[in-house]
Amino acid sequence: MDSEHFIEWYPGNYGIALKIKNKIIEKESKYQKIEVYETENFGKMLVIDGKIQLLENGEKSYHEPLVHTVLLVHPNPRHVLIIGGGDGGTIREVLRHDIEFVEMVEIDREIIDISMDYLKIDNGILYNLINKLEPRANLIIEDGIEYIKNCKEIFDVIIVDSTDPFKAAEPLFSEDFYKYAYRALDEKGLFITQAGSLYFLTENAIETYSKIRKIFDKAYIFTSPVVGYVSPWSFVAGVKGNIDFKKVDLERAKKLKLEYYDPESHEALFYLPRYLKDRLLSLFRSENNFLSFRR
């Protein structure tokens, strides 16, 4: 990185570069290196361990498909669990729904403080969480896998908003974690996680999908372009019980006025490139007409 640009490299020497004005803060927490930059055209940028996490002008392109796909598919989401999400974008989107309560479990308090003080994409929710002022939400500073392993509560939806599967986030991509998540869901429940760049981290996406498919009753892999990431970006959803992941509640969706995720084009998210579809079929040898792959 020169003094004017931030570059994140992906496999194959393929990168994404942004022109920056200045570095706002750099801090080494117990778990990760956290940086915030002011970019030339995209507002503030959050970087963790050298990887772009979000751009202020465009972060909804990640948070909307992560959150609203599952919350609009679930017929009655009342209790939600977020693992990670310290920047505040995921809980901001969750609280736009008529839920009863959301539990947010974040391992690193430093990312919350930095996001609250410098990013400010959360509409004040992080401050309210820390000060116990948000009646529909609670914040727990804890390792997500330890929390869900010992959790006695039952949730309708579990959303994992983590960094890529390295260092502190690696256990969140393990079969054990997915087993705990399945157990923590109600008899009709949904789970979702990000799974990396489809083209440049293909094996990560396939591995994540494969593990979730082994644990959940159904599994779906879908993609959406994300500003600041090498897109298309992949997401994997796991279904417990009888929930039709093809069916979106369009009446609820109309009230949200989303900017990036289009519920009316929900099925388009699941159109996979031919090479990946063939790869999944060779591995699992079953499909339905919605490009989901069942165990």
Language model features: what each stretch is:
Residues 30, 40, 106, 229-232:
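A short, structural micro-pattern
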Residues 169-245:
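C-terminal substrate-binding/active-site "lid" region of AdoMet-derived donor-dependent transferases
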Residues 27, 139-142, 219:
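Short gly/ser/thr-rich secondary-structure transition/capping motifs
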Residues 1-35, 210, 233-295:
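SAM/dcSAM-binding transferase cores
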Residues 19-22, 32, 145, 220-224:
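Glycine-rich, charged/polar anion/phosphate-binding loops
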Residues 1-72, 96:
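Rossmann-like AdoMet
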Residues 27-29, 130-133, 230:
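Solvent-exposed alpha-helices and their adjacent loops that cap or buttress functional pockets
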Residues 2-3, 54-190, 200-204, 208:
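The AdoMet/dcAdoMet-binding core of the Class I SAM-like
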